Amino acid sequence: MGSEMCIRDRDKLEEIAAAMAKTAKEAGVEICAGDTKVAGKGQVDGVFITTTGIGRIMDNANTSGKLAKAGDAVIVSGDIGRHGCTILLARDEFGIEADVTSDCAPLWANVKAMFDVTNDIHVIRDATRGGVGTVLYEIAGQSGVGITLDAEKIPVADEVKGVCGMLGLEPLYLACEGRLVIFAPKDKAEDIVSALRKCKNSENAAVIGEVTEDNAGRVVMKTEIGSQTLLPQPGGELLPRIC
């Protein structure tokens, strides 16, 4: 952080530190060390925070983007697209106002809740860069399988739908900072969704599709009228990255 910032925005720095402490406590994480750097005047325009996390590998977990299997259910841990939509509105480039808040949240409690009910989980991914749609295409390619989604089952907040409708954006490709994409056998899906819905920030968890042997490497969408269409794969970022 710049030396000027330490004086001019001391209150902001204290606010950030308090938020870090609150979130770490919520996630059960200890902040055990810290350091600061001083940069010359004009070299930075805000606060830069870099973290290194150290944890333990779960003994009962065996997940990978290469382990999705035909017959698996595709699950999301909550409604999608909130974070990307929130950042878009915060930039105030389109003059749109909507009551949308980011889904940013720690996810360890949600992961633990799933493994408390079953170890039979094949894939877990966060849906940050590129959103849920990009993650699904990556998993389909890594596992050599197809994925069929049901448009009616994908949870999207009405406010996010409205903003996306006005700007021609697809919620599936908006970043999520507090959502998981999970692949697990269909007979485990109900237990996983039930466990997630008891967790903070996962009240809208839902099964949104299934893994298929056909259409390998592709994601197909079953529309509200029952037809099927290939989900387009964007060639780049829909919105400028901020992280």
Report residues per predicted region.
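Helix-biased detector of long, well-ordered alpha-helical tracts
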Residues: 3-4, 8-243
